[in-house]
Amino acid sequence: MGDIKRADFYDGPAHDYLGYWKGRDYEHDAERIAIDSLLTGQHFTHAVDVGGGYGRITALLPKYADHVTLAEPSSRQLDVAARFLGEGIERIQAQAAHLPFAAGSIDLVTMVRVMHHLPDPTAELAEIARVLDPVGFAVVEVANLGHARNRLRRLGRGIPAGPVDIRSPENRHDDEIPFVNHNLDTVTAQAAAVGLHVVRSLSVSNLRSGTLKRVVPHRVLLRVERAAQPALARLRFGPSIFLLLTKSS
């Protein structure tokens, strides 16, 4: 699949990640609800948002941490982040597998919409475990291969254990960044192997549908989403699963 650590996919002028999120208010708010649900009542010394692009999720973290850092490999996304985030949030260029922090020095790590670029996330999960404080938390979002619609499609065949490339055949080139969905059991085993254990999970973007977004008021979608996230987590229903991880078993 080529060099999956490259940042040039998001450095290219044709890739407008900020623009990508226009019209995706439901998806953003669903992820905001998940972050708030997992972190409400907690306060941290230093939060790091890994692979956070222009800072969409990073911007949610100052109310939970004294110091917030966006660690992003793309120089272009960091330039956009400087305008989007403004002052008060540190921005550094770093790969998820090579974070410039001392072992055990970070008490909150978030990594959202990064796993779908990582066919094998072992190195990145191990790096999160390395920098995470022994009593800290990590929030990792997983693109869920076993979501309800896919389980119906694969009825009788089961869900593959390994990652599945969701790119169209014409876009499957070695010079393109991977886009994969993961088997959640495999990911939780990979996390456990590096010392990260699941404390809680949420099913996110459960109502992601162009039709629903057109006909159902936004506030109603969010009300249902808020109630559905914990309720549907056991079913692994949604296309996105948020995991709250800790180094304590």
Language model regions located:
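A short glycine-rich, Lys/Arg-flanked "PGG" loop and its adjoining helix->strand segment in the class I
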Residues: 122-137
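A conserved beta-strand element that flanks and buttresses the S-adenosyl-L-methionine
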Residues: 110
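Conserved class I S-adenosyl-L-methionine
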Residues: 1-53, 56-60, 77-80, 84, 138-165, ...
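A C-terminal cap/extension of S-adenosyl-L-methionine-dependent methyltransferases
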Residues: 153-160, 184-189, 200-249
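Class I SAM-dependent methyltransferase SAM/SAH-binding core
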Residues: 52-98
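Acceptor-substrate binding/catalytic loop of class I
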Residues: 170-186
